[in-house]
């Protein structure tokens, strides 16, 4: 019973469509009708600016962290935190409060890892920032960090680096989260191939792509 309640709570927590609600309540803008139409951090930054984007990022990360820590907070030591965190990501991606159309799972996945394996998250965040600096594309940075997450969760425990031992629940969760992130970035991958992906005005833009107009 406790497990079901925790799963439900995590899903509902993840379902809070941060960017969408910030847009509606503070800016009177429906994010679905602007930019990429996505309700996640990237589109919020692009359409509503730095303050709204930063708030969305932090709240979306916090949703994942809080959900992951729920079993600890209620004293359910027999329930795996990573499993509960996973349901927050599902909520974020398929939110009941926003017609089951949510974000691309990146920020909330980061939040889950922050609650479960913070040093490992720091490593993946470094991969993300480095890729972002080199190519100026948030989508490519998210995809690269996801692929590196899968490779590293399978190899790091063998080298006792950042992940001390194999944790099959963490491994499965990382693989599934990476798959969700990659699937949610199908349109971005097409645009990266066509060299028409949205760039941010930071970094080296190594692919020498011309800044695209907003899609």
Curated annotation (Swiss-Prot):
Localization of this protein: Cell membrane
SMART domains registered for this protein in UniProt: G3P_acyltransf (SM01207)
Protein family per UniProt: Belongs to the PlsY family.
Presence of the UniProt keyword Nucleus in the record: no
Record key words, sorted: Cell membrane, Lipid biosynthesis, Lipid metabolism, Membrane, Phospholipid biosynthesis, Phospholipid metabolism, Transferase, Transmembrane, Transmembrane helix
Known pathway: Lipid metabolism; phospholipid metabolism
Record's keyword annotation contains Membrane: yes
Chief place where the protein resides: membrane
Segments traversing the membrane: 3-23, 42-61, 68-90, 110-130, 134-154, 162-182
EC number: 2.3.1.275
Organism from which the protein derives: Streptococcus equi subsp. equi (strain 4047)
The protein's assembly and partners: Probably interacts with PlsX.
GO biological process: phospholipid biosynthetic process
Protein name: Glycerol-3-phosphate acyltransferase
Gene responsible for this protein: plsY
């Amino acid at each position: 019973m406790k497990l079901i309640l925790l799963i439900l709570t995590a899903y509902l927590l993840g379902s809070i469509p941060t960017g969408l609600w910030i847009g509606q309540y503070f800016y009177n803008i429906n994010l679905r009708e602007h930019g990429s139409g996505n309700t996640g951090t990237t589109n919020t930054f692009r359409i509503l600016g730095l303050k709204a984007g930063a708030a969305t990022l932090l709240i979306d990360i916090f949703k994942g962290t809080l959900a992951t820590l729920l079993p600890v907070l209620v004293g359910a030591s027999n329930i795996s935190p990573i499993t509960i965190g996973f349901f927050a990501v599902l909520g974020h991606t398929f939110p009941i409060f926003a017609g089951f159309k949510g974000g691309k799972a990146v920020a909330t996945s980061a939040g889950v890892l922050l609650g479960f394996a913070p040093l490992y998250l720091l490593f993946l965040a470094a991969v993300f920032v480095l890729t972002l600096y080199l190519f100026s594309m948030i989508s490519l940075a998210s995809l690269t960090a996801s692929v590196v997450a899968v490779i590293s969760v399978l190899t790091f425990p063998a080298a006792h680096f950042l992940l001390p031992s194999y944790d099959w629940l963490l491994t499965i969760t990382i693989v599934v989260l990476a798959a969700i992130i990659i699937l949610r970035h199908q349109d971005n991958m097409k645009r990266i191939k066509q060299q028409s992906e949205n760039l941010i005005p930071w970094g080296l833009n190594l692919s020498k792509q011309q800044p695209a107009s907003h899609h």
